[in-house]
Amino acid sequence: MPDFFPFPLLIGVVMLAILLAILWRRKRSPSHLFCFSVFWAYLLLVLRETLFPIPFLGGMDGMRTMQQATFVLSHVNFLPFKYFAFHNKYVVFREIALNILLTLPLGFGVSFIARLKSRGFLWLAFAAGLVIEIAQLVISLGIGGVYRTVDITDVILNAAGVLLGYGLFRIFARLYLAVTRRFGIEQHGLLACVHDVVSNAGSWRSAS
């Protein structure tokens, strides 16, 4: 079965170049551009792991037939942790770990790109996995077959990953400030960018 894989990496690199040019014109610092590039690379990796490759099932002609759409929808799982009962402990642990690790960098790193209040992280945690699962469902409907399992469990675990990443960021922020103040480390370049982000972390929380 051939795979429908429209050069997502190339498209992502082109989009990154355009966004960096826009940010540069808006006088963003080189450190911010670096953080943005790393975060963008992470997002491309997430897309690669969750959506690609897309199997090509004889023509991408919309929602296909009603029978195929019904078949796809019948394989959507809305019962949390339903399939865990059918696997051994190793498989269950692996699935939990991978789903959490997938979005953990999102919860940790998004603060270097945008300023979110604590409430915003709750919305981000919910949206992260939901967007991925909806995209998988739409693609499955479009190709007329189940190519990825759409499961509410993944949404829950992805949300947990975002919140865990945010918690680790909060810990990192406090440790970073404590260490730099204790040893009088000067903040220049990338360190200055990091210091600015972690210094403002407390104000985002209090404003929530």
Predicted features along the sequence, with ranges:
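Individual transmembrane alpha-helices with interfacial aromatic-anchor signatures
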Residues: 149-160
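Bulky hydrophobic segments
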Residues: 1-147, 163-208
